[in-house]
Structures are given as C-alpha cells and as structure tokens.
Amino acid sequence: MSDTIRTLQGRVLSDKMDKSITVAIERKVKHPLYGKFIKRTTKIHAHDEQNQCNAGDIVTIRECRPLSKTKSWTLVEVVTKA
C-alpha cells in the first residue's frame, strides 16, 4: 500500500442526504484518435460530518475506509462557498 492519502478537489452536486454529499470530479482525457482533450466527470459520495456543504461549493475530499456501500471518501475542507 502507498503511504500517501489520495485527495481530490471537486464541486458539490448534491447535499440532500444526511451527513453525505455528492462531489463531481472533473478530469481531461485525450481522445485516442483525434487528440482533442475532452472533459469527463466522476461522481463520488463523501462523508460530511457537520452538514456544512451546500450545492455548488468547491471542496477537498480524501480517501478513507469504506463508510457504507458507496461512501469511501470524507470531507477535508470547503475551499470556496457557493
């Protein structure tokens, strides 16, 4: 196992669940044939203990042990409020 903890930065899509948020992580992928860079998004469920996030916030999340069937990330900080 690696010693570094994975951290990602993304935008909160939904905060409707109790103590959970849905974060959209955007990355750029090069098209295999044409070479153009395309935006791709990944949705990740993260744990928000204090329910401090709102939709549209930019947040930093880090990987942790599995907290539920779909949650294995936790909120580190809110970078910018929406």
UniProtKB/Swiss-Prot annotation:
Sorted UniProt keywords: Ribonucleoprotein, Ribosomal protein, RNA-binding, rRNA-binding
PROSITE patterns, alphabetized: RIBOSOMAL_S17 (PS00056)
Record has RNA-binding as a keyword: yes
A GO BP annotation: translation
Presence of keyword ATP-binding: no
GO cellular component, one term: cytosolic small ribosomal subunit
Molecular function GO labels: rRNA binding; structural constituent of ribosome
Pfam families the record matches: Ribosomal_S17
Family matches, as CDD domains: Ribosomal_uS17 (cd00364)
Family to which the UniProt record says this protein belongs: Belongs to the universal ribosomal protein uS17 family.
NCBIfam families for this protein: PRK05610.1, uS17_bact
Subunit composition and interactions: Part of the 30S ribosomal subunit.
Function summary: One of the primary rRNA binding proteins, it binds specifically to the 5'-end of 16S ribosomal RNA.
The protein's name in its UniProt record: Small ribosomal subunit protein uS17
Lineage: Bacteria, Pseudomonadati, Pseudomonadota, Gammaproteobacteria, Alteromonadales
